[in-house]
A protein has these predicted regions:
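Substrate-binding cleft of carbohydrate-active enzyme catalytic domains
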Residues: 1-24, 35, 42-47, 52-54
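Active-site-proximal structural scaffolding
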Residues: 7, 29-36, 133-136
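Extracytoplasmic/secreted cell-surface and envelope-processing proteins
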Residues: 22-26, 61-64
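Composition- and surface-driven signal marking solvent-exposed, interaction-prone regions
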Residues: 28-32, 154-162
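Glycan-recognition surfaces
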Residues: 41-157
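Carbohydrate-binding surface patches
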Residues: 131, 135-137, 141-149, 180-206
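Membrane-embedded transmembrane-helix bundle of lipid-linked glycan/lipid transferases
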Residues: 167-170
């Protein structure tokens, strides 16, 4: 499979998902963590100098072995999923939780791999996030993440959406100088030589 993807098709990067499936259990001679580390090392060895975006993977076993890694849950098309999913599942799709993961795991970015906080949205179709929720998601990902991707189809963007996309892309080049989470999320950053401070209240995204 990897020969086909790398050598025949010519891809230089693969996204490998659901990697936690390599180590659902340990045994008396090998812990889950050790088994997971061995699996990631195997993927690293066969990928050689090709880049890996790991997803659905325990973070620590992949330190230093992949170029990029998802560092939280999937974002959703709404803010925090439906109520019964919140009652039944600790690990689930949640835009709110994805933002919290992006903030709280920001220190890993550029140290053990580049953080992938999942995608952001600008589109208005097939989405139940408010404009502010979409804007907060994109800005936090741009400032604190290491991978900045959208699942939108840019072909459907209006001129205003294109302008907003370029604004977010520029924000991704900012230098973050301080992050405070005592009351909400406050991020201080420098862009074009100017210091800026923005505040987010991610309790309900309003």
């Amino acid at each position: 499979v990897f020969h086909q993807v790398y050598d025949v098709w010519g891809f230089d990067l693969v996204k490998l998902d659901f990697l936690y499936g390599a180590a659902p259990f340990g045994n008396a001679s090998e812990s889950r963590a050790k088994r997971m580390k061995r699996a990631i090392q195997f993927l690293r060895d066969i990928s050689k100098d090709k880049e890996i975006l790991a997803c659905g993977v325990p973070l620590m076993p992949s330190f230093g072995l992949v170029e990029y890694s998802r560092i939280g849950c999937d974002v959703g098309l709404d803010w925090d999923d439906v109520f019964y999913m919140r009652l039944l599942h600790r690990e689930r799709i949640s835009t709110k939780n994805a933002i919290v993961n992006t903030v709280n795991r920001r220190q890993l970015n550029g140290r053990v791999f580049m953080n992938d906080p999942d995608v952001f949205f600008i589109r208005t179709e097939n989405i139940h996030l408010t404009d502010k929720q979409k804007d907060d998601l994109a800005r936090i990902q741009a400032l604190l993440g290491g991978v900045f991707l959208t699942s939108d189809s840019p072909a459907n963007y209006t001129d205003d959406m294109i302008r907003k996309y370029h604004e977010y892309r520029k924000l991704a080049s900012a230098l973050v100088t301080d992050v405070n989470t005592d009351e909400g999320i406050t991020i201080e950053y420098v862009l074009d030589g100017k210091t800026n401070v923005i505040h987010f209240d991610c309790t309900n995204g309003k």
